[in-house]
C-alpha cells in the first residue's frame, strides 16, 4: 500500500491561517508582532531563506524588517546591532541567519539575543527550558516535525522513534521533543553500526543527515511514519532528501516529500514563535 504523502505546505497553510486570525486580534489590542532578520554576506541560499521568511510574515500580518550587512562586518559591530534590537520594543523576534562568516562566533551571536526574542529557539536558555519541559521558544524545524507527526493522527506515546542525525539544530532537539511526547527514542548517527537494525524497528523515522538518498526501503519498517529533513542538490541540479522517496513510499504509511515536506513547516513555526513572543511581551 502506497504511503500518504505528508505535504508540509498544506499543514503550514492551515497553521498560517490560524496565526493570521491571532494577529488580527492582537492588532485590535494595539499589538503588532514584529520580526527582524539580520543577514550577513551574500550566500544565495541564505538570501532565499530570508525572502521566504519575509513573505511568510507578510502573509500572516507580522511586521518584518531585514537588515543586510556585508561579510566584512566585525563581530563587535554585529553584537551592537543585536543589542539595539534587544532594546527596541517594536521588535518581538530577532533572527540572525546562519551560517555566519568564519570570523564571527555563532555562539556569541546567539547568546547575545535576548531569550524572550529568540524566535529561532537556539539560545542556551531556550534549549535549557526545552530540556526541562518548560514553556519556551522551540527550535523551528524540530517543532514543525512534531506538528507534522501530530497531523497524521499518529499517537507518539509508546511508539519507537528513531532519529538519524545528532545536530544541535534538528537531531538533538527533535529527539527531546519526541521523548516529551512519550515516544521511546533511539538516536543514530554517522558512527552507528548496523543502522538497519535500528531503523527497521522504528514506528517513526526522522532522517536528518544531509546525505542524499542514504535511506532505502530496506531500512524502513512497513507502516512507519517517515520524516525526511534532508535537502540535497544532486549533480542533475535536482533537490532530493536523505530518503529514497520513490521506493520508501511503497513501504511507509506516511512520508514527507523533498521539497515541500518539512521546509514549509520551519518558517511557519518561526511565525508561530514570533506571535507567541509578541503576546508574552505585551503582557510584561
Curated annotation (Swiss-Prot):
E.C. designation(s): 1.5.1.5, 3.5.4.9
InterPro entries named among the record's database cross-references: Aminoacid_DH-like_N_sf, NAD(P)-bd_dom_sf, THF_DH/CycHdrlase, THF_DH/CycHdrlase_cat_dom, THF_DH/CycHdrlase_CS, THF_DH/CycHdrlase_NAD-bd_dom
Listed GO biological process terms: L-histidine biosynthetic process; methionine biosynthetic process; purine nucleotide biosynthetic process; tetrahydrofolate interconversion
Pathway: One-carbon metabolism; tetrahydrofolate interconversion
GO cellular component: cytosol
GO molecular function, one term: methylenetetrahydrofolate dehydrogenase (NADP+) activity
Catalytic activity: (6R)-5,10-methylene-5,6,7,8-tetrahydrofolate + NADP(+) = (6R)-5,10-methenyltetrahydrofolate + NADPH; (6R)-5,10-methenyltetrahydrofolate + H2O = (6R)-10-formyltetrahydrofolate + H(+)
Keywords from the UniProt entry: Amino-acid biosynthesis, Histidine biosynthesis, Hydrolase, Methionine biosynthesis, Multifunctional enzyme, NADP, One-carbon metabolism, Oxidoreductase, Purine biosynthesis
Binding, NADP(+): 165-167, 190, 231
UniProt family annotation: Belongs to the tetrahydrofolate dehydrogenase/cyclohydrolase family.
Function: Catalyzes the oxidation of 5,10-methylenetetrahydrofolate to 5,10-methenyltetrahydrofolate and then the hydrolysis of 5,10-methenyltetrahydrofolate to 10-formyltetrahydrofolate.
Assembly notes: Homodimer.
Name of the featured protein: Bifunctional protein FolD
Organism name: Brevibacillus brevis (strain 47 / JCM 6285 / NBRC 100599)
Lineage, uppermost ranks: Bacteria, Bacillati, Bacillota, Bacilli, Bacillales
Amino acid at each position: 500500500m502506497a504511503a500518504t504523502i505528508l505535504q508540509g505546505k498544506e499543514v503550514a497553510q492551515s497553521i498560517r491561517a490560524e496565526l493570521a486570525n491571532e494577529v488580527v486580534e492582537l492588532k485590535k489590542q494595539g499589538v503588532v508582532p514584529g520580526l527582524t532578520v539580520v543577514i550577513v554576506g551574500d550566500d544565495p541560499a541564505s538570501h532565499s531563506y530570508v525572502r521566504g521568511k519575509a513573505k511568510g510574515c507578510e502573509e500572516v500580518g507580522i511586521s518584518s524588517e531585514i537588515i543586510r550587512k556585508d561579510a566584512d562586518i566585525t563581530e563587535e559591530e554585529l553584537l551592537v546591532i543585536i543589542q539595539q534590537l534587544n532594546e527596541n520594543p517594536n521588535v518581538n523576534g530577532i533572527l540572525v541567519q546562519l551560517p555566519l562568516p568564519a570570523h564571527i562566533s555563532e555562539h556569541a551571536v546567539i547568546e547575545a539575543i535576548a531569550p524572550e526574542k529568540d524566535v529561532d529557539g537556539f539560545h542556551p536558555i531556550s534549549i535549557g527550558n526545552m530540556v526541562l519541559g518548560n514553556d519556551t521558544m522551540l527550535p523551528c524545524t524540530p517543532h514543525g516535525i512534531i506538528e507534522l507527526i501530530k497531523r497524521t493522527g499518529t499517537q507518539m506515546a509508546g511508539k519507537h522513534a528513531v532519529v538519524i542525525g545528532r545536530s544541535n539544530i534538528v537531531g538533538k532537539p527533535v529527539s527531546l521533543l519526541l521523548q516529551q511526547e512519550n515516544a521511546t527514542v533511539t538516536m543514530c548517527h554517522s558512527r552507528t553500526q548496523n543502522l538497519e537494525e535500528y531503523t527497521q524497528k522504528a514506528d517513526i523515522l526522522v532522517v536528518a543527515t544531509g546525505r542524499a538518498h542514504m535511506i532505502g526501503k530496506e531500512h524502513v519498517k512497513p507502516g512507519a511514519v517517515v520524516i525526511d529533513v534532508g535537502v540535497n542538490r544532486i549533480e542533475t541540479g535536482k533537490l532530493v532528501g536523505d530518503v529514497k522517496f520513490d521506493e520508501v513510499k511503497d513501504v511507509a504509511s506516511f512520508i514527507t516529500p523533498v521539497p515541500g515536506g518539512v521546509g514549509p513547516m520551519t518558517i511557519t513555526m518561526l511565525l508561530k514563535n514570533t506571535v507567541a513572543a509578541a503576546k508574552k511581551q505585551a503582557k510584561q
